[in-house]
Structures are given as structure tokens and as C-alpha cells.
Amino acid sequence: MIMTLRWFGKNFDSVTLKQIRQIPGVKGVITTLYDSKVGDAWKEEDVKNIKKEVEDAGLKIYGIESVNILDDIKIGLPSRDKYIENYIKTLEVLGKEGINLVCYNFMPVFDWTRSDLAKVRPDGSTVLSYDQDIIDKIDPQKMFEQIDSNSNGFVLPGWEPERLSRLKELFEMYKGIDDEKLFENLKYFLTAIMPTCEKYNIKMAIHPDDPAWPVFGLPRIIVNKENILRMVNSVNSPCNGITLCAGSLGSNPKNDIPDIIRSLKGKIFFAHVRNLEHTAPGKFQEAAHLSSDGSMDMFAIMKAFYDIGFEGPFRPDHGRAIWDEVSMPGYGLYDRALGAVYLQGLWEAIEKMGK
């Protein structure tokens, strides 16, 4: 297995590369140019610099999360071709630097949605949580402001300030965009970029929608096994696949995560593994990675990855805020380090049992 940690860069992350290097078994990072403007092509110099910084710390960049996709592309505006061309230029820069994985999503407006960034767990830790009743009663603008004010001063991925100023405009732009239209626009995007991906062997790994159902009336198209299989089969390329995020798909208890993993053999390029606790229909709290702390069977999930021969990068996903750490919600050092070691322990046990 290749264990990694997500790292947002020295100017945006409370966790340092030195600290990541000291987590047992962690070989590298999944990172991004966090200050890049969505829609612009990345500069070769910037990619070289962050690659050198990571390698100087004794680590490796195993992938990018994310090269965000402008809403013009998702909506299918006439301007999309210009921004797809910029995206292709970015892929070329990454490919020339030997970076061969991009995790991305195709969620409208919000990359992910939570009702609380600091829900208190029985052990006193705090976690991200979702309550559909709260979401149903809150205005999107108000929710955005609330999330931003509770971010501990960090810019959250997918919640960039420039989106806040355009929120009402974006909702207007998505009127008339249903699941089918959004899927058509995803297929258009993938068809356009696949030749470049194949040239440089860049695996495009779409991230499931989070949570795995419609929010604020916006379409959601990557929420279950059927959606994912349709997506990977719609654009036939060895570079078109999935980031298997156990937590995002697991937000809907109807999704059988081990079954989904086995159904996608050969199409999973990257894995996010985390636990959550279902508290009621449409309500969940994130939890420690340990199976008994939540509703998900982490052993069964890791066993499914082992059974399909998965050799790509893993990362522990959102961690609890523990031991008085102040960090970007979900992305502190301590609980993710615990998660990384726990997942590797499961993998070692499964591997030895299989011999």
C-alpha cells in the first residue's frame, strides 16, 4: 500500500512536511497549488517549486487534489472550451513533472456540505457533521458565512471566499441544469482531456459527491455504484476512473462500500478512507477511523481493496480535532496520523492472513 496525507502547502496548512514525514509508513503527500485561481493554467515554475519542497522533505507527491473545475465547464457555458484548454495546459505541466494522478469533483457550487464543523463527540473531540433538518432550514448564503466563520481562520477546500461573493449568481446559473445535463457536461470535459491524460498517463479520479444526495436542489451525479459505473463506461479510457471515498459514499447507508470497491476493480486510482456514524436518516457525524467509533466496517473496506489488488495511494480522510490542536477542520495532524497507522495495521493483518 502507498499511504499518503493531504497537504495544502506551507502557507495554508498547520501541518508541516517534517511532521508528515514522521508518521510511520507515510510515503508522500497529495497536494495542490492552493492559491491558484480556478480556471487558470498552472505555471510550470510553481509545480516545480512545490515538487522540490516535498522531495527535499524526504517525501513524494503522489497526486494532486485538486485541479478545481470552473463552473463554466460544469454548466456547459460557451466559455467552457477556453477553460478546458487551460485545464489541459495544467495537465501537461503535471505530466512533464511526473505527477500522474488528479483527484477532482464535478459538484455544483459546493464541493462538500456540512451543517457543523465542530460537533462534539462523546469523547470530547470535535468533528464535521451533517444534519439535513438544519440544511433544509438555512439559506445557502447564510450557511456559507457560518462555515467560513467556523473554519479556525483557514480557507476550506471548495469554500473559497470568491465563491461567497457569487453564490446567488451561481445558483441562478445552475437553473435548468439537471442530473442528465450535468452528466453530459462531465462527459464533454472528460472526452476533451483524455488524449492529454493518456499521453502523460495521468489518472483522472473523480471524487464522489458529499453527501451522497442532492443538496439545495442542486444536481448530484456521483452518489452510488450505478452512477460511478455509468461514468467510467461513458468515456472509455484507462485514465478515466474514481477516487473511492468511503466517507462520501458511506454518508448514504444504502451504499455497500466493499461491494462498490469490488465492482470497480481496475478503475479505482485513489482511496480516501474514513469512518462516520449514522445518527438518523439524513444525519451523520464523522468519527475516528476505528470501526467501533462509527457505523462503517473499516476491516471489510480495507479487505475489499486488498482483494482487488489495489496498489494506488490511500490517505486517511477527515480527522477529529483532538488534543487541543487548532487546524483546518478535518485536517489536523494528530487524528489523521492515528488513522494512517490504523489503516496500515489493518492492511498488514489482511496481507499476512492472505499468505
From Swiss-Prot:
GO terms for molecular function: ferrous iron binding; manganese ion binding; mannonate dehydratase activity. Pathway: Carbohydrate metabolism; pentose and glucuronate interconversion. It comes from the Bacteria. It catalyses: D-mannonate = 2-dehydro-3-deoxy-D-gluconate + H2O. This is Mannonate dehydratase. It holds the Pfam family UxuA. Belongs to the mannonate dehydratase family. It comes from Brachyspira hyodysenteriae (strain ATCC 49526 / WA1). One of its GO terms (biological process) is D-glucuronate catabolic process. Catalyzes the dehydration of D-mannonate. Its cofactor is Fe(2+); Mn(2+). The gene is uxuA. Its EC number is 4.2.1.8. Keywords: Iron, Lyase, Manganese. Gene3D superfamilies: Divalent-metal-dependent TIM barrel enzymes.
